[in-house]
């Protein structure tokens, strides 16, 4: 086993630019990497790489704490969260902290506590990162073999994978415990317009939970993004947490099978590429979730979804014109279809007009008006509550549209306001990050496969055109 632990610091990949610049005593000659290649110099220095990762975690947690406190400092309780450009407080509110019926914020102290806790823990991580980057041992293999590793040691790598899976499983169960025992979470579907409640009757049926994975991603199906009750979400986290923990134990106790040893590339850069690929998938899924799902991301905090704002507009004008005497059941629109109501391809009664394309929207302010065959005409005439009118009017004017210069709303609207929905920001940012992570996955996967095949040499420097040109200066 000891033969794996090599103190060789040179990792043979050709690098660009000059090697004369020495940074922190690590120049290109000793490490095989130029200054700009950053942590690549630490590939075989497990102690220093630990420092880089812990310091990075410290930066992440510091951002979370500082941004959290910034949002608390700027928060105005009289305005909805989505009008204030907030992206962290909506997550805390969704977890049931500081909010009451209808998503109204009744206490900002839990948000303050969250920010301070993150700041304090970021200081601990920052200290640990600096310690391991500058003072701690360069390599962990000799002094702390449990924390040491060599990238090609397949058994150790799957053990580390197992530990990570167990930690992810514990994270999933933290949400379950919050929903079950520690005050509950915010349920946008609670009667009368949403409230915080404990989730007692979990959905644990595998046919339901895994049925989401087998659904089509299109239209009214919507794959896992179509989940619309908290029992399914929390039950899904029970399943996910259990699978992650059991899978983690499995990977700690077992060694990779022969087919896995043959199929995968076993190097640091290969693991980096696998991780980037996984993060890319997470980014794309998160993008779709925050854009379409108003249960995991309640509209009270994140603003309405696109389809929701569109349906809200149709509903608002149906209410107005019905009050003015229109017969909404039979009024004909300019196309010959129903002006307010029409039938979907499968026969349900739906809102007419341009919003017909969003007919499969489900939203808590609208569902009480549906019957067995779609929207119920008698309920539309008799049962519309003031809170439904208020909420749809609010959502109609806060569609998740907007440009980078923060002039929100429909581009042709002359009375545009400075409003960009957090859904727009979160969906766009996660799509862009997911894309770049995917490109990074392809890049590092290509390099890792080439290195494993033995032809990672970069460009042949002997015949590079620039060598025969006169210096720029």
UniProtKB/Swiss-Prot annotation:
Its main location: plastid. The modification N-acetylthreonine is found at residue 15. The chain crosses the membrane at residues 69-93, 134-155, 178-200, 255-275, 291-312, 447-471. It is a multi-pass membrane protein. The modification Phosphothreonine is found at residue 15. This is Photosystem II CP43 reaction center protein. GO terms for molecular function: chlorophyll binding; electron transporter, transferring electrons within the cyclic electron transport pathway of photosynthesis activity; metal ion binding. Keywords: Acetylation, Chlorophyll, Chloroplast, Chromophore, Manganese, Membrane, Metal-binding, Phosphoprotein, Photosynthesis, Photosystem II, Plastid, Thylakoid, Transmembrane, Transmembrane helix. One of the components of the core complex of photosystem II (PSII). It binds chlorophyll and helps catalyze the primary light-induced photochemical processes of PSII. PSII is a light-driven water:plastoquinone oxidoreductase, using light energy to abstract electrons from H(2)O, generating O(2) and a proton gradient subsequently used for ATP formation. PSII is composed of 1 copy each of membrane proteins PsbA, PsbB, PsbC, PsbD, PsbE, PsbF, PsbH, PsbI, PsbJ, PsbK, PsbL, PsbM, PsbT, PsbX, PsbY, PsbZ, Psb30/Ycf12, at least 3 peripheral proteins of the oxygen-evolving complex and a large number of cofactors. It forms dimeric complexes. InterPro entries: PS_antenna-like, PS_II_antenna-like_sf, PSII_PsbC, PSII_PsbC_sf. Binds multiple chlorophylls and provides some of the ligands for the Ca-4Mn-5O cluster of the oxygen-evolving complex. It may also provide a ligand for a Cl- that is required for oxygen evolution. PSII binds additional chlorophylls, carotenoids and specific lipids. Belongs to the PsbB/PsbC family. PsbC subfamily. One of its GO terms (biological process) is photosynthetic electron transport in photosystem II. It is found in: Plastid, Chloroplast thylakoid membrane. One of its GO terms (cellular component) is chloroplast thylakoid membrane. Residues 1-14 form a propeptide. Pfam families: PSII. [CaMn4O5] cluster binds at residue 367.
